[in-house]
């Protein structure tokens, strides 16, 4: 049984925070299919401390959502500590994850995200600051990171041990380097090596979990204690039902035909509209429609119109034009979401690699907005 601080998590599955995706409606939809730990969108510590209303609005959980899980991004140990203190003292969440895995150039270029673990003292200071504020309130802190900056600057083993010594409740590893972004294949062997190095807290594996069988294979291959699912559930919230069945040893659910997929997509739209209002809610659905319909014979015109859908009524009309008896297509399986190609190099501040022991705070890497 995966244990995150005081919270048992079964099945041992965590929904990775994804900007613009893992809001309260999407988490509710996923939870209708299966249990697990569902993390809300990433929130920046600077914006939270500054009282940014958008950030506070993102930290909304349904009454039956427990534990309430949030991921924070920050580069300054002082600000991170202030943000964590705010969260725990105001009882805004039950679990806090720290983001050290973001590979986006606008973040790493200024010394944030997946660039931070290279600076061991800075990384340790941030983690300890969060743990020190959260522990008295019984709120577990976890970290999510990557293998390293690139193959010449591997950081995950040192970072894992540092985080463990600092008192985190678990360590999650996306088994890619920052330079890979989401391209290529995740190196699951690194998850196994991290599991051998970090012995007192759970180790979670992330990267290329696109089917329930992938999760079982990763855990068997690496010995990790649980899996983190990101892109694999985009347009496929029923993946959590498949994961629950696999971990419970039950037969896999029947893959949904297009009629069932359309019902889930409409349910998602209703939840978004209820949360955000008719206009914004339906706009938020647009990016999901391509994920839901991947592999189905829909037709370019209807697919395009769904990507610009403006109301629930129009959504119903467009769904009515589909051949809803289509079985679930094999083409819908496998990698989904952003993939791209590896960068030629990781954008970093000038001289960033010169001194891995520097604890200097890269203040320019602070993000003022409420999401990543």
Region locations from a protein language model:
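Alpha/beta catalytic cores of nucleotide-metabolism and tRNA/nucleoside-modifying enzymes
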Residues: 1, 5, 9-13, 19, ...
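Glycine-rich, positively charged N-terminal anion/phosphate-binding segment
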Residues: 1-3, 18-94
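N-terminal small/glycine-rich loop or linker at the start of catalytic domains
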Residues: 2-14, 46-67, 102-112, 130, ...
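Active-site mouth loops of central-metabolism enzymes
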Residues: 11-21, 67-80, 116-117, 143-156
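Hydrophobic faces of well-ordered beta-strands that scaffold small-molecule active sites
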Residues: 13-17, 38-40, 68-72, 94-96, ...
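Active-site beta-loop-alpha junctions enriched in small/polar residues
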Residues: 18-20, 43-45, 73-75, 101-103, ...
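Alpha/beta enzyme core
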Residues: 81-112, 116-202
